[in-house]
């Protein structure tokens, strides 16, 4: 498949901070990994997914001569996957609690990836943490903990239910996201986050908000290339029999892949269709 798109996925990072009882060997090493659902979501006909290992030159993660710009030059698009909190230091704050310290090493790595792909005009899509990282990279800030800092907030995370935690979102009328779902003013999405966008970056516009608390759920860049972030996990949208009004992730994926094909200059195969609202 010489014409296959090559989509990079940012890595989660496991840091062996302290010995884990009952574990050893590989768990004493720094690990780069991804959750398989996000890879399976990206893998479509004529699309290959590759995890991009961190190439941090300072701190715990070291690299040779390869740079993030080399990946951006070779790959056709970037998915910033979910995971651990963003460190408050990445947006000019200090942690309000030790549990909200986040991962500064991963922040630097993913911000570098983000900047490299944007500089190349390659499309970028952010999922959950990835959406928050886009906002931070462009100058915005976050709620370190929505329940603590926003009294009117609904439940955005339930560890016991995880991806089975759903709530309603409203699509902003006239937005490109709304255009992907004709006739859909609101829908259900899964919700697995306790942080969220507080101050929106100047170059972003809001495309979806949570109902009824108004927490920002989707953003898009006003710049020249494709850049979209969503607070939910489209790769986890699987419980359709229980949530028939959930937002189908296929139109968003198709738009992202179309942007990658346009940037590369290749024709598109048949669009993905998963079968939910939209």
Model-predicted segments: where are they?
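N-terminal beta1-alpha1 cap of cysteine-dependent amidohydrolase-like domains
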Residues: 1-125, 136, 143, 147-181, ...
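Active-site-proximal beta-strand elements of phosphoester/diester hydrolases
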Residues: 228-231
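Active-site loop->helix "elbow" adjoining a glycine-rich segment at hydrolase catalytic centers
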Residues: 129-131, 138
